[in-house]
UniProtKB/Swiss-Prot annotation:
<comment type="function">
    <text>Reversibly transfers an adenylyl group from ATP to 4'-phosphopantetheine, yielding dephospho-CoA (dPCoA) and pyrophosphate.</text>
</comment>
<keyword id="KW-0067">ATP-binding</keyword>
<feature type="binding site">
    <location>
        <position position="18"/>
    </location>
    <ligand>
        <name>ATP</name>
    </ligand>
</feature>
<dbReference type="InterPro" id="IPR004821">
    <property type="entry name" value="Cyt_trans-like"/>
</dbReference>
<dbReference type="GO" id="GO:0015937">
    <property type="term" value="P:coenzyme A biosynthetic process"/>
</dbReference>
<feature type="site" description="Transition state stabilizer">
    <location>
        <position position="18"/>
    </location>
</feature>
<comment type="subunit">
    <text>Homohexamer.</text>
</comment>
<feature type="binding site">
    <location>
        <position position="42"/>
    </location>
    <ligand>
        <name>substrate</name>
    </ligand>
</feature>
<feature type="binding site">
    <location>
        <position position="10"/>
    </location>
    <ligand>
        <name>substrate</name>
    </ligand>
</feature>
<comment type="pathway">
    <text>Cofactor biosynthesis; coenzyme A biosynthesis; CoA from (R)-pantothenate: step 4/5.</text>
</comment>
<protein>
    <recommendedName>
        <fullName>Phosphopantetheine adenylyltransferase</fullName>
        <ecNumber>2.7.7.3</ecNumber>
    </recommendedName>
</protein>
<dbReference type="GO" id="GO:0005524">
    <property type="term" value="F:ATP binding"/>
</dbReference>
<keyword id="KW-0963">Cytoplasm</keyword>
<dbReference type="InterPro" id="IPR001980">
    <property type="entry name" value="PPAT"/>
</dbReference>
<feature type="binding site">
    <location>
        <begin position="129"/>
        <end position="135"/>
    </location>
    <ligand>
        <name>ATP</name>
    </ligand>
</feature>
<keyword id="KW-0173">Coenzyme A biosynthesis</keyword>
<dbReference type="GO" id="GO:0005737">
    <property type="term" value="C:cytoplasm"/>
</dbReference>
Length: 166
């Protein structure tokens, strides 16, 4: 398998849902590029460097076990531009439910119009991770809740440290 795919997102933070999609994608491609979107108008909880570190620590072993190369990059422009820079022929997108499908179909259509050489592949979320969103994880962590069921252990530790009361 020498196909390259790009999986773009904010990953703030990386969740078990993201990891599920990454695991599935690594089974399909020889090289998976995870592209962290950096947008000047947004204030993320974790810096792009921290998010990249968390993704690598969590997902490098998964990619290795699946026989896929994993690369983490940042981008501040269009995902199609990031895909072209990465030499990707596929966009990977995870789907949790019908609402995701509606949005992702629009996005796939626009991406296809801009980069017809890059095909979108939808990967359905495994049952146990469907309700997980990074937004909900951040909210739970900010209120002192236990996020361990929703994120990798290292991410849970970083969230606890970030929201620790002095």
């Amino acid at each position: 398998m020498n196909r390259t795919a790009l999986y773009a997102g904010s990953f703030d933070p990386v969740t078990n849902g993201h990891v599920d999609v990454i695991r599935q994608a690594c089974r399909l491609v020889g090289r998976l590029v995870i592209a962290i979107g950096v947008h000047p108008g947004k204030t993320p909880l974790f810096s792009a460097e921290e998010r990249a570190e968390l993704i690598r620590a969590t997902c490098d072993p998964i990619a290795a076990a699946e026989g896929s190369a994993l690369e983490v990059v940042t981008f501040d422009d269009l995902a199609v531009s990031a895909a072209r820079r990465a030499g990707a022929s596929l966009f990977i997108r995870g789907l949790r439910d019908g609402t995701d499908l509606d949005y992702e179909m629009q996005l796939a259509g626009m991406n296809s119009a801009m980069a017809p050489e890059v095909q979108t592949v939808f990967l359905p979320a495994s049952t146990g991770v469907r309700p997980i969103t990074a937004t909900l994880v951040r909210q739970i962590a900010a209120m002192g809740g236990d996020v361990r069921p929703f994120v990798p252990e290292l991410v849970a530790e970083r969230l606890e440290a970030r929201f620790a009361k002095p």
